[in-house]
Amino acid sequence: MFKKLTLTLAAFCAAGIFAAEKAAIAYPGYSLEADKGGLVIKDGSGSRLLKIGRQLFSWAPPVAYPETVTQIAPDTLKVDYRIDKDKSGQVALSATFRATPEGTIFADYELTAPEGMKTGGIMQELQPIGVKKLPELFKSGLWTRDDNGGVPYEVRDGYFRGFQGKRASVWLQLGGNANYTSSWAEHLSYKKNESGKQSASCVFQLTPPGTTGAEAAALLRNRPLTLTLATGKPFNLWDSGVPEFTVNITNPGSQTQSGVELAVTARDYDGRSVLNEKRLLTLAPHQSETLKFQLPEAERMIWFAEASVKQGGKELLFTRTSLAVLPPHEFQDRENSRFGMSAYFPVPDMESVYKLMRRIGVRILRHGDNRECAKYGLLALDHANVPKAQDPSKDKARLDQILKRAMEFENPEIEFCNEWNMGLKPEFHRKYAERYAKLLRQFRQLCKERNSDIRIIGMGIAGDDPKFVRALAAAGAWEYFDGGIAMHPGRGNFTPDYEKNQWSYLGSIRRFKKVMGELGEKSIHLSEVYAATHANDWWKDSERQAAENVVLTYALGLAEGVASIQFYQLHDAVWHDIGGVNHKDSEYSYGLLRRDGAVKPSLLAYAAVAEQLDGAKFRKYLTFNDLHVKGVGFDTPRGPLAVVYDRTDGMVQSKKAPDFIHLEPWVDHWKTHREVTLPAISDEVTVIDSIGRATQVKAVDGKVTLTLSGAPLMVYGLQF
């Protein structure tokens, strides 16, 4: 707290800015001063915290050294840099640093560089002196209401790097690629400006020691409060008992916040309001309040919680999460399971992730280390890519690297390369198919030399793409696919049983199988199947649609006899931005879990369908007198299982529209719900919904009446 630094915001504002003999900006709580080789940030006692030094071009020879520091305004320093290793003689760099009484320092850089010089890798030297650089970024997302009334979503608020000290800390709002980092530098992203030069920026924030990332983000963004929901449980998941969560509200600033209206609500999957509480709070400077809330006990359920804050009747901010109960379950036929996971991240940690995947019924991993994951009953394959346009002289080293890892990780099969056909024009099919076949021959020879019996799964084909698949066979690749071939049946705004569109799930599988019949049967691995939940995107699922579509994805995949069905992916976000947020990019929304690991309905659906298809054998597709009723029949150790649903409302989930919105996950989106009478083999049938909740329905005279919609039900006790 700034009080601990012997100042408050009021003291800040009352203090005058002064310039020392050397260029400096000083406030009672901190100062920014010229220092040999750059600028230094000091705390109120004069202790050095962080030095801002050189800029290294990294991808080009020049290095920029701070040479002169000039005070151009009471609150602004200008730095001019000396450029070394500049053969062009055309590189120039200057920067301004504006420091405010609130502890914020705005750094703006302007670069002149000749055309062709690589400036994309420039790193700003930041030397921790009286602070320790935190290893984890704080990736701030700001929950936002949709202008059209759709579901709320997170917007990227900024990524923040912390430098924690005993008496003060410094937080940096990154101005570049968060992955370009080291113990002493951070990346700056230079972009061309209107003058033809290049600009970059970043922002520093002085804070009290112990300030969290959320509090630092609020200070940098001039928000008076922070608001977080937490459970302390991995994935916000319970196996029994009463779920509970905390709401933390903090005033990170130096002014009292009064009249703070806190509202906390929660709904279950059926739309019932199970929590609706309000508090009126006053928060002194740096005060934090944590409130605890409980949800009803349930055997299996998911809830959606929201906390919001208003002042003067205006909403300042809100946040959301989801919580669930998923009871324990042991799978009986794990060895033969075809349920897989295409990608996953260590959020919150790998042990928790492995345990979760075991619980929900995952058997096959697209990649992983069997020395670790085998302990959890998981079988890791390998997946590796060689860029299709890579310089062939680099192929041998890359192939050697791929095989070495697969042997070390004890992977029995490897999916060799990925989606070379994506966006590939037909006239290039032959060229790259022949390159791929050559790589396969090289890789197989390398396997022989290393005494490796690893099987090759042909590259994951984007969609069914029969022309490219035929080109692979013509080039001689087919004989090497002793592990089968992979395919990614991308699915648009259709239910999984739709067949007509190129980007339809069942349609892609059946078209792919037809090509297999022409070229020679190979086992098919669906190494990426999808139920993305990009908010208010007409091409993607809502969270409720995703849960329903996960059930059908696996039921239909098993019915079609594929070797594995690997869901893409466990977590939201992307591999190069784990835990990140980017509302503009749908790639961040493919998970069964939210970016922070919180459970989505689709995770419960994955567990539900895995439980019911444990040990199942496909019997037949079901037909009924009512042509709108569809079904898939399986024999299971628990008896005959029918996955049934109604298609009165069709298979197209949405229409393209600029103002398209998704419904909330607790809202049933099907227009038609019909009572349908079906033949039964017992006096009672068991009906299991998309998230795994079971109910018993009485049958009379060998018939049972079920209420059907487009949402699939898994039913034991039907005659077929």
At which residue positions do the language-model features occur?
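Polysaccharide-binding surfaces and accessory modules of carbohydrate-active proteins
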Residues: E21-A23, P101, F106-G176, P234
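Extended, loop-rich substrate-binding clefts of extracytoplasmic carbohydrate-active enzymes
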Residues: Q55-G116, W184, T207-G213
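C-terminal beta-strand-rich structural cap/linker in extracellular carbohydrate-active enzymes
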Residues: Q198-E215, Q696-F720
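Carbohydrate-binding surface patches
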Residues: T246-T250, Q255-S258, T623-I681, A711-M714
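Noncatalytic carbohydrate-binding groove/subsite architecture in carbohydrate-active enzymes
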Residues: A433-Y554, E560
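Aromatic/acidic polysaccharide-binding cleft in carbohydrate-active enzymes
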Residues: A531-Y606, Y621-L627
